[in-house]
């Protein structure tokens, strides 16, 4: 199959309620196939929901272990929270793919963080998402 290079998907996110707040989410793995990495990201990390014509990215899990360990070596969400524990809601701004054949990822692929939404704001959106998804996301 040949040797895999270290690849990373970097997702640039913007806080839904504060346009000045931006976060970068990254997931790293060894793979030659970008589609495997994007599929792993979509299945293990985030769900996207379209509201009023805008696609929002919702962090569903903060687990640092993804289901397909032979594809995903490491995923790093650091302080990105689980949605069911309060969570954040972001609008996706851009998605970047980083790859290094020497196994090193440069500093340009590091993460920045944004702030937590207020409890009342989050509850309001959780209720809307619960209706949209057809099940209750609130504890």
Swiss-Prot record:
InterPro entries: Pneumo_NS1. It is found in: Host cytoplasm; Host mitochondrion; Host nucleus. Transmembrane segments: none annotated. Keywords: Host cytoplasm, Host mitochondrion, Host nucleus, Host-virus interaction, Inhibition of host adaptive immune response by virus, Inhibition of host innate immune response by virus, Inhibition of host interferon signaling pathway by virus, Inhibition of host IRF3 by virus, Inhibition of host IRF7 by virus, Inhibition of host MAVS by virus, Inhibition of host RIG-I by virus, Inhibition of host RLR pathway by virus, Inhibition of host STAT2 by virus, Inhibition of host TBK1 by virus, Inhibition of host TLR pathway by virus, Interferon antiviral system evasion, Modulation of host cell apoptosis by virus, Viral immunoevasion. A motif (DLNP) lies at residues 136-139. Its main location: host cell. GO terms for cellular component: host cell mitochondrion; host cell nucleus. GO terms for biological process: symbiont-mediated perturbation of host apoptosis; symbiont-mediated suppression of host adaptive immune response; symbiont-mediated suppression of host cytoplasmic pattern recognition receptor signaling pathway via inhibition of IRF3 activity; symbiont-mediated suppression of host cytoplasmic pattern recognition receptor signaling pathway via inhibition of IRF7 activity; symbiont-mediated suppression of host cytoplasmic pattern recognition receptor signaling pathway via inhibition of MAVS activity; symbiont-mediated suppression of host cytoplasmic pattern recognition receptor signaling pathway via inhibition of RIG-I activity; symbiont-mediated suppression of host cytoplasmic pattern recognition receptor signaling pathway via inhibition of TBK1 activity; symbiont-mediated suppression of host JAK-STAT cascade via inhibition of STAT2 activity. Monomer. Homomultimer. Heteromultimer with NS2. Interacts with the matrix protein M. Interacts with host ELOC and CUL2; this interaction allows NS1 to form an active E3 ligase with ELOC and CUL2. Interacts with host IRF3; this interaction leads to the disrupted association of IRF3 with CREBBP and thus reduced binding of IRF3 to the IFN-beta promoter. Interacts with host MAVS; this interaction prevents MAVS binding to RIGI and inhibits signaling pathway leading to interferon production. Interacts with host MAP1B/microtubule-associated protein 1B. Belongs to the pneumovirus non-structural protein 1 family. Plays a major role in antagonizing the type I IFN-mediated antiviral response by degrading or inhibiting multiple cellular factors required for either IFN induction or response pathways. Acts cooperatively with NS2 to repress activation and nuclear translocation of host IFN-regulatory factor IRF3. Also disrupts the association of IRF3 with CREBBP. Interacts with host mitochondrial-associated membrane (MAM) MAVS and prevents the interaction with RIGI. Interacts with TRIM25 to suppress TRIM25-mediated RIGI ubiquitination and thereby RIGI-MAVS interaction. N-terminus is important for IKBKE/IKK-epsilon reduction. The DNLP motif has IFN suppressive functions like binding to host MAP1B. This is Non-structural protein 1. It comes from Human respiratory syncytial virus. The gene is 1C.
